[in-house]
Amino acid sequence: MPPEFKAELAERYVTCVSGEIAVSTVPELLEVTQSWVDGLSENCSDLTASVVEPEVDVEAPADVFITAPGQTPECNAIAASPVGIDAVAVSVSVEGLDGVLFTPELLHRALSGGMTSWADPELQELNPDIELSDTPVVVRAATRPQDAAALNEWMSRIDSAGWPAIPSGLVSDASFDIDTVITELETEGTIAIVPASLVTNNSLQTISIQTQPDIESTFVTVESVISAGTQMVATTSGSFVTAALDASLPPIPAAGNDVASLPWQALNQFTMTVCAGSNEEAGRAFARYALRLESQGAMTSFGFTEMHEQVRVAGVDAVSQGLPEPTIPPSGAPEEVPEEISTDVPTEEVTEEPSEEVTEEPLEEVTDEASPEPTS
């Protein structure tokens, strides 16, 4: 079955199997993961899912892991796919400096402790229309390693001379307490590398970047992060999908637009891994559910970014291997799959008996069990 068609089926029909699974997730995606667990449980009466917080339930086993860059799931993996994106932003705590323009070279100097005042002459030259104050620069040194790495990859790629390595003023710190970080950012003059979701959810000020001379500056926005996401290319090996940003590819304009937003290319991916074991089929069903387009909307709702369609479709195809294909129940449901998703695939692959006409009623999500389960 073509991956695109399988993704359409995953969107319209919830695949249900019997089982009981625990899903381990990173703290920042706790609410997103809980929404997926709740949605799957509501649709599948014989599948029970729960969320495990590894920092709290240290010894609790898990059947599915959702991890951040640099983290390795503690299991024998049988399938994996990117499941969402969080960009990396540079926050500034100086009134009136939202969007203040930096070059990679000046940002490197600031994060290395070489820019001591927000009235720096080079910064003023880059921002002639902003009245800068002589506020001391306070560098928040503690930075998550994945955030430093993502920003470093982007900055060094566009200006290797001005950004030769991770700035010396930063200290790798994997711990990240949101309340503590927010409190530290209240100090006037602070500059810090933080997740873009933190910026979005707390309305923080951020800098913009001049990626090339005489080119419009790039801001970290929903549109610019989505634009960068369209430059990601999926690679599939069996049930495993990885994705990497290819900066040589032109970003794809959003629907209804002729021109794509300038991409903000400091990105981190979250990866979803299904573990081998007695619950692996249920784990695959959860992964498939999380990669549905409707389910991906939870990422956006909580300040993150959903995977680009090309990567998402590849992920659905990979994690679905071995799962029963959704079929239409013999009663209480439309008799034929809508024309728009059955054009290239014979009807008998997705329906149990031929029909002479398409029902006039809207198609509801149904499960592949003998009788329809309510969906949400």
Identify the residue ranges that each predicted region occupies.
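Flexible loop/hinge segments at secondary-structure junctions
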Residues: M1-P338
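Ser/Thr-rich, Proline-interspersed low-complexity disordered segments
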Residues: P2-P3, T327, S331, E335, ...
